[in-house]
Curated annotation (Swiss-Prot):
Homotrimer. Its cofactor is a divalent metal cation. The gene is ispF. It holds the Pfam family YgbB. It comes from Pelotomaculum thermopropionicum (strain DSM 13744 / JCM 10971 / SI). This is 2-C-methyl-D-erythritol 2,4-cyclodiphosphate synthase. 4-CDP-2-C-methyl-D-erythritol 2-phosphate binds at residues 8-10, 34-35, 56-58, 61-65, 132-135, 139, 142. The record marks H34, T133 as: Transition state stabilizer. It is an enzyme of class 4 (lyase). GO terms for molecular function: 2-C-methyl-D-erythritol 2,4-cyclodiphosphate synthase activity; metal ion binding.
């Protein structure tokens, strides 16, 4: 068994869609970034890559590479799943937290779990997503950005994909 930890943060700006866990969420602002800026998916990817000892998303999907401009983070998450598979690793579970003052995320959490599980070809029950605020403190509390934390547990399957 191996464990990995991921963290990401993106700035909230006008004129961008808000995508979290592969779900488009109605809101007056969205996250700024090279890809779709899905802060939750990015934290999950870093946790998985960390568990695999395979670096981070910046190494695999650099923000100066035009191939990733505007790309769906669900496509990148699927590629991370492939990296794990090639190393003979399978996801046991993922636990994550989104830190945002708004919007209210509880209506979207189940769909986030389904989307990320689908990208990784695992069961939604293997993906936990929680949301919290910072009670108005810090950049997230002031509505300047959204952060996400994730922990992933993986295990060796005994079969590395080629």
């Amino acid at each position: 068994m191996r464990v990995g930890f991921g963290y990401d943060v993106h700035k909230l700006v006008e004129g961008r869609p808000l995508v979290l866990g592969g779900v488009s969420i109605p809101f007056v602002k969205g996250l700024l970034g090279h890809s779709d800026a899905d802060v939750l998916a990015h934290a999950v990817m870093d946790a998985l890559l960390g568990a695999a000892g395979a670096g981070d998303i910046g190494r695999h999907f650099p923000d100066n590479d035009g191939r990733y401009k505007g790309i769906s983070s669900m496509k990148l998450l699927a590629r991370v799943g492939d990296i794990l598979s090639r190393q003979g690793l399978a996801v046991v579970n993922i636990d994550s937290v989104v830190v945002a003052q708004g919007p209210k995320l509880s209506p979207f959490i189940e769909e986030m779990q389904k989307r990320m599980a689908g990208a990784l070809q695992i069961q939604p029950s293997q993906v936990s997503v929680k949301a919290t605020t910072t009670e108005g403190l810090g950049f997230a509390g002031k509505g300047e950005g959204i952060a996400a934390y994730a922990v992933a547990l993986v295990h060796k399957t005994g079969q590395a994909a080629t």
